Structure formats: structure tokens, C-alpha cells
UniProtKB/Swiss-Prot annotation:
Belongs to the IlvD/Edd family. Coiled coil: none annotated. This is Dihydroxy-acid dehydratase. Its EC number is 4.2.1.9. It holds the Pfam family ILVD_EDD_N. It comes from the Bacteria. GO terms for biological process: isoleucine biosynthetic process; L-valine biosynthetic process. It comes from Campylobacter jejuni subsp. jejuni serotype O:23/36 (strain 81-176). GO terms for cellular component: cytosol. Pathway: Amino-acid biosynthesis; L-isoleucine biosynthesis; L-isoleucine from 2-oxobutanoate: step 3/4; Amino-acid biosynthesis; L-valine biosynthesis; L-valine from pyruvate: step 3/4.
Amino acid sequence: MRSDAIKKGHLKAPNRSLLRACGLKDEDFDKPFIGVANSYIDIIPGHYFLNDYAKIIKDEIRKNGCVPFEFNTIGVDDGIAMGHEGMLYSLPSREIIANSIETVMNAHQLDALICIPNCDKITPGMLMGALRVNVPTIFVSGGPMASGVTKKGEKISLSSVFEAVGAYEAKKISEEEFKDIECSACPSGGSCSGMFTANSMNTLCEAMGIALEGNGTILALSKEREELLRKAARRICEIALDERFKIRNIITQKAVRNAMVVDMAMGGSSNTVLHMLAISREAGVALDIKDLNFISSKVAHIAKIAPSLNSVYMDDIHKAGGVSAVMAEISSRQGHILELDALTITGESLEERLKNAKIKDENIIRKVDNAYSKVGGLAILFGNLAEQGCVIKTAGIIGERKFKGEAVCFNSQDEAIKGIIKGKVKKGNVCVIRYEGPKGGPGMQEMLSPTSLLMGMGLGADVALITDGRFSGATRGLSVGHISPEAAEGGLIGLLKDGDEIEIDVDAYTIHANLSEEEITQRKKEFVLPQKEVPSRWLRMYQKLVSNASKGAVLDME
């Protein structure tokens, strides 16, 4: 056993003495040691109950002949961190989470790992850390919350509240309606109820085979979710010493491809691109951002979920057959785009896992021949504005897929919010928010507040927004993010001026500023990088080491 390094032989008597102080007995030193990586924190609605979930898992591990050791990672709630300097810390928290998993697991030489994530950066951070450790691993998330319901009976989610801010600013809703939306949108614990980043990543864990069926869709705080926890705990005990189930044997090139197929079919958050690039790097798997358009071109968008479709939420997807039903439909209708021989954590191939899966409600999960779109719900655009690529969630577009307009430039998200409220962004404009990339922020803030303001003010179908920052999974509209190279590293987005004409063609995968090469060269000569004070030592360290979004915004020591 890997854990023999801390428990076997007379030289390890001091180690055992400390373990005995934790309650271990003689017989425990012959059992596998299982790390239980929790992410319990009171301030995140998807995490405040995870201490109870960890108890369920630990009890089941003990019943099945292993010894659990619970430890915790940090967590940041993107919704609460939104709209102020707290958002600078969201993406960097992913690296802290990854480092903490690696540190605890390797410092104590635990044999296997079960991770309990749920929201935002916690799932990708845990995946990255687990891949570095490379022991048998299972992910079981806390689960999505139920959708909210207003007094009028309308189903809503957190994104509805952000958009209500814009509607209230524009005097389109009353104070009473505004309050009702605020108080109704998040009715229970769990990750936010739509296909936002948290649910996207928990769904992709299922698609990659590192989580059991239902991981992405079974509601939080339900008896069904508790049984999933027990099943995951039993399974980690069964495979704790089986090298076939080391996480790098599960998250392979095939698994990563399957994740991106499901991402396209379900219109996942644009953040998944950033995270899957980082996860692939830790797995030693090649994933080039340029490959994603090929996958998108081969995969129909068959499940549309809030915020893209405000009548459908994660619990609806579960009732309609879940992620397995989506994958089964894609595999039966779209050739060999899915890698059906990929190994899952149960020991089954993906094909075996899907053999009984079927769509139970075609109004929720559509057949391929009745898809929302013949291509996937994400696209990568290239052009002189994004030579290394940028990302758009095509599933969230509500207006035209081709757009031409004059730039209105802002050098920060805060500046943009003030400008939008003052009416500086008008119908037909391209709102440009720059110096918000991984280095420029630093931290690559989410632009949910600006996009939601535009939606709430009735401009969502008539304005495009481009940024070197990123978007919440709750964003909709013609919103282009992750522009690389970013402004802080000399990207063209930093050279734009108010009035410059910008063209976006989603179906042609292009984004272009209509400037001559001579004009661009002249602007580069005149360009002076704005200086931004970064008082935080951690953020300065992050700024120095982080790559741009086209590489996953990873810390790069090379």
C-alpha cells in the first residue's frame, strides 16, 4: 500500500503514535487509507451542507473496511464575489485548491481519494490536484439546487437576479417584483440550478467517467443524492488498491474528448474550455483550443438549459434521462464522435454504462434530428482580435450570429458597469472590456454584471460584448470572452479605440477589427501599457506566473 510509507515497520513508530492520537487502532494499520477531500464552507449555498455529506461518506468507508481521513479545501462563491475586488480571487483559487489536494495527499501518502466538490472553481481545482497525485479517485459533488419560482409562478435562477438588476435600473420592473426575484431565485442548498459553470463541470466529471451516473443532475439535499454518496464511498473502497483506476487511467485523451462532446451537446459554460485546457495539461493529455471547433461541428446541441432556456433546469434534465441519455442519443446518431471504449470508474466501458440509457422526455432532451442546432453550444473564434482564440457560448446567443458594430472601450469591468448604467453603450455597439485577462486583472474576472445589465436594459440582442476576461455560466447574449493574447500582453484588444469597427461571425468562427496593418503597426508604436497597482502579494505572484486563457490560465514555471 502507498500508505505503508507512514504506517509500516519499526521506523514508523512515531508516525503510528500520532495516528493513534487520531483514534486509530492496531487493526487499522492493515487497511487502506482514503483521503476525503471536502470543500465545506458556510458562505457558499452549494457547500454549507457538505460537512454532513462527508460524514455519510466516512461512515460508509469505515463499514467497507477502509480508514477515511477528511480534509478541506478553500472555496470561493463566484456569485457573492461578483461585482467587486473579490472576483480577482476566484480563478486564482483554483490553483490553491489544486495545490492543497496535492499537498495533503502526498504529505500523508494516502492510498485513494474521494473528492466532494460542487461550485465554481472547486471541481476543476480538485481535478487538477488529483491528477498530480494519481491514485484511485472518485468525484461525487454536492448536487444542483432546485430552480426558484416567483409569485407569478415563473421558474427562475440566480441569473434572473443579475438580469433583474438591469431591468430595475431601466425601471422595467417594480421594487416589489425586484424583491420577489431576489428572494425566490435560490430556494435551497446546491449549485446554482442552471447549466452554469458548477453544473457544467460536475456534468463533465460524469462524462469523463470519474463520477457515477447522476453526479451532474441529482438534486442536492435529496435522498437520491445521499445514496449516490454511499455508492461512491463503497466504490472507492473496492478500487483503493487497484492501479487500473488511478485517475490518469480514467481521465485519458478519450475521456477528455467525451467531456467536450457532452459540453457541446448540452451548451455548457464557456469556463469549461478554460478548465478543460488546465485539466488536460495536468493529465498529460493534448487538448488544443483549435480542436474544439471540429468537435462542435460534429455534435448537435440537444439539451438547452437555463440561462439559455429559462424553462429548463438541471432537475428537469435528470428526470428526462440525465447525462447518460444525452450521451446515448449522441452515440446512436452521430457516428463515432464519442469514445465508447473509454474506461469509467465503475469498471464499465462508457458503452456498457450507456446500454440502458434513453431519453424520457423529448421536450427536455431532444433527438438529434430535432436538435436546437446541428452544431455544439460552444465555439472558438479566431482573427486579428484573437490570434490565439477566444470563446463564445453559442447556446446563449439570443440575437444574430453575425454582428458588426462600433467599439465602445472600457479599461476595466468597473468602468464598464458605470458606462453601461450611464447609457454609453447603445444599440449596435460592441462593448469592449479589457485589462481583465489572467495577467491584466489579474485574475480574469467574470463579466456577469455587465452582460446582465445589458440584458435587463433590453440591449441583449442588439449589443455584442468582447473581453479578455471571462463570463459566468449564467451569461447569455453575444458575449465573446477569453480573448488571447490579452491586452496586458500586447493583444490587439488593448489597441482598440472608440468607434473602431468590429466584425463577429460565429458561423465562420471569426472575430476581426477592421483596421489596416499600417494602423495597427502605428498604434503598437504608440502603445503604453497602463499601470495597475496590485497590492496583494498573492495576486502579484499569480500575475507573474499565469499563462493566457488559450492555455487554460495555468501557472507556468517554464
